[in-house]
Amino acid sequence: MRLTAKQITWLKVILHLAGLLPFIWLFWAASQGYFSADPAKDIQHFTGRMALKFLLASLLISPLARYAKQPLLIRTRRLLGLWCFAWATLHLTSYALLELGINNLALLGSELISRPYLTLGIVSWVILFALTLTSTQYAQRKLGRRWQFLHNFVYLVAILTPIHYLWSVKILSPQPVIYALLALGLLAWRYKKFRQWWR
């Protein structure tokens, strides 16, 4: 049975809660001293993982809609992308304020350039920023064919962000590897699409 427009609306509500409730938990956990001896790192990793989860979820929508024969699922993709950007912005902000400190924000530019894993992160954020700005139907009409070209850069983000995560951890653990494999799998599903571009 195919999902109805009303069911998609309720699904969007659930997805909004999935994006908002972790933020409420994060605020509570930080206020209660829930994190380790290095809470700044914990918060950075948490916000980064949330951004990556929403990115992977947005990439999952197309194959899921196709194989489950639920075309209306595509309507949730933009919402997932917006939450990805929101959490990515929190991730960047947490690094700037908690790692560098408000008195050292002038160092942010040099830090992003001098540390390769940070460079990958900021490139991904800039792409997500551009995709967010042009995610409306109005932007799609204005850009025409260029809109699809621009939004194909989400696949570059799907490559860069798992590398950024793997590179940022001092001790390799299963979690970043799992995210990298999931991203690789979602990109591999689009293999034929990529081949058409390269011809």
UniProtKB/Swiss-Prot annotation:
GO terms for biological process: protein repair. The chain crosses the membrane at residues 8-28, 82-102, 116-136, 149-169, 171-191. It comes from the Bacteria. Pfam families: Ferric_reduct (PF01794). It is found in: Cell inner membrane. Its main location: membrane. Binds 1 FMN per subunit. Keywords: Cell inner membrane, Cell membrane, Electron transport, Flavoprotein, FMN, Heme, Iron, Membrane, Metal-binding, Transmembrane, Transmembrane helix, Transport. Its cofactor is FMN; heme b. The keyword Glycosyltransferase does not apply. The keyword Membrane applies. It is a multi-pass membrane protein. GO terms for molecular function: electron transfer activity; FMN binding; heme binding; metal ion binding; oxidoreductase activity, acting on diphenols and related substances as donors. GO terms for cellular component: plasma membrane. InterPro entries: Fe3_Rdtase_TM_dom, MsrQ-like. PANTHER family: PROTEIN-METHIONINE-SULFOXIDE REDUCTASE HEME-BINDING SUBUNIT MSRQ. Heterodimer of a catalytic subunit (MsrP) and a heme-binding subunit (MsrQ). Part of the MsrPQ system that repairs oxidized periplasmic proteins containing methionine sulfoxide residues (Met-O), using respiratory chain electrons. Thus protects these proteins from oxidative-stress damage caused by reactive species of oxygen and chlorine generated by the host defense mechanisms. MsrPQ is essential for the maintenance of envelope integrity under bleach stress, rescuing a wide series of structurally unrelated periplasmic proteins from methionine oxidation. Belongs to the MsrQ family. This is Protein-methionine-sulfoxide reductase heme-binding subunit MsrQ. It comes from Enterobacter sp. (strain 638). The lineage of its organism: Bacteria, Pseudomonadati, Pseudomonadota, Gammaproteobacteria, Enterobacterales.
